[in-house]
Amino acid sequence: MAKEEFAREKPHVNVGTIGHVDHGKTTLTAAITKVLAERVGGAAEQTFEAIDNAPEERERGITIATSHVEYETENRHYAHVDCPGHADYVKNMVTGAAQMDGAILVVGSDDGPMPQTREHILLARQVGVPYLVVFMNKTDLVDDAELLELVEMEVRELLTEYEFPGDEVPVVRGSALQALESSEEHEEKIMELMEAVDEYIPTPERDVEKPFLMPVEDIFSITGRGTVVTGRIERGRVQLQDEIEIVGMQEEKMDSVVTGIEMFNKTLEEGEAGDNAGILLRGIEKEEVKRGMVLAEPGTVTPHKEFECEVYVLSKEEGGRHTPFFDGYQPQFYFRTTDVTGSIELPEGVEMVMPGDNATFEGSLIEPVALEEGLRFAIREGGHTVGAGVVTDILD
């Protein structure tokens, strides 16, 4: 009897290409899939045209064009996102539609850093893309070695300016187009780039390993048994008899113990990240719990009202506002499972925010929510989405 082929489970990492328009992000993405398909195998090559023709997705009421490709190195399996337009990058990074554990910053060696290079680095810093690796593309168009040195220096300084370790970030030079056209020299550069990505971007901690958190979606009372809270477990694991805290929508936390876990009407010993579960809580009345609260491992989350955020405001064409908003604007902030009213304070020197803009400002909620850096939210008016954002700092 033939033995089953040994399939090693490689660790999975999410990455993407970022950088200025026409510096070669999509060409590089295609080149990576081609070179790795030929040299490592595992996933098929994707053409430039297939990647460039990005399908549209909806995330938090926003339409975003994104291409997803996958490829493998000897050590890892990668999911890679590439966006056709600048606005798609902004939306993608702000909504977290495509979570990135690290990104490849593509800089045209002929141009050097350009306005969107800077903007993408800033966005990566704001929304928490923790690691960047640089690919200096189009080196075949530059004869002057000193010019290449200068571009690398500029990129490193720019990274340092936005609090990335500019001196340590790996920088690889090559031509994605030449690699696509099977130039041995430039294929080697793609391999060198992927070695840098393998080594420099750490494997992320899986959601299951993080402290338990489940947003409350629904609450039921079961006669003789107590209160059941349902929701999708966002991270971590929960087991019978675990102590948990109920946090949000009020200043005080409540304590309880898990006395039952159900999924699809079957009882479980434990629930984990991604499960839609019903959790039976000891000593809690149905009236005490409401949507917008979270169940969490004790001591891991706290309720807050004041925060700083990075936000993308929908354009009129995307179904957003037709007019700008000003300091003191009061929308609903939709965190996890509920809307909370809040007001915004624009930074000094910013008069207003136009539809289609991305902006940084401070938000202030009327009720506390289990906020943390990196938490995504929608901004809504009368039940429809006018913006999407991410918490970049807690202020209270």
UniProtKB/Swiss-Prot annotation:
Keywords: Cytoplasm, Elongation factor, GTP-binding, Hydrolase, Magnesium, Metal-binding, Nucleotide-binding, Protein biosynthesis
G2: region residues: 61-65
Protein name per its UniProtKB record: Elongation factor Tu
UniProt organism field: Salinibacter ruber (strain DSM 13855 / M31)
Region of interest (G1), residue spans: 19-26
SUPFAM superfamilies membership: EF-Tu/eEF-1alpha/eIF2-gamma C-terminal domain (SSF50465), P-loop containing nucleoside triphosphate hydrolases (SSF52540), Translation proteins (SSF50447)
Reactions catalysed according to its record: GTP + H2O = GDP + phosphate + H(+)
Stretches for region G4: 137-140
Region (G3): 82-85
Top-level division of the source organism's lineage: Bacteria
GO molecular function: GTP binding; GTPase activity; translation elongation factor activity
Pfam families, per the entry: GTP_EFTU (PF00009), GTP_EFTU_D2 (PF03144), GTP_EFTU_D3 (PF03143)
